[in-house]
């Protein structure tokens, strides 16, 4: 194992309507406050409960915000990015990059309503077999006495 984590990177357009508490998330990053080594991008650090982003459900902590209302966030100071969000208006369009860790090994898709975990029969069958062996050994031992 090389210790490296692989990611599946996807982009998504998310439209939010500013609520009473703003857009409902905090950001980190910028050219003066790099959040990720060698990356001056702007990242979501926290989703506020009951905020616009939480109600929408698509924006996640750790997502990289690429643009706000079509304006690129590359090479911005942190405060300039904050100001851009604050002045974006009520209807805000975000271009977001999600990074999902790639699972090693096969991916198993379960059907809806299908239980997860180990089936009961997989547990009970070995227990039943061991019980039968113990009973057989006990009966055989008693016959020898």
From Swiss-Prot:
Domain PDZ stretches: 13-100
Membrane topology field: Single-pass type IV membrane protein
Cross-referenced SUPFAM superfamilies: PDZ domain-like
Single GO MF descriptor: type II activin receptor binding
Chief site of localization: mitochondrion
SMART domains assigned to the protein according to its UniProt record, in alphabetical order: PDZ
Annotated TM spans: 118-138
Name the record gives this protein: Synaptojanin-2-binding protein
The organism of origin for this protein: Mus musculus (Mouse)
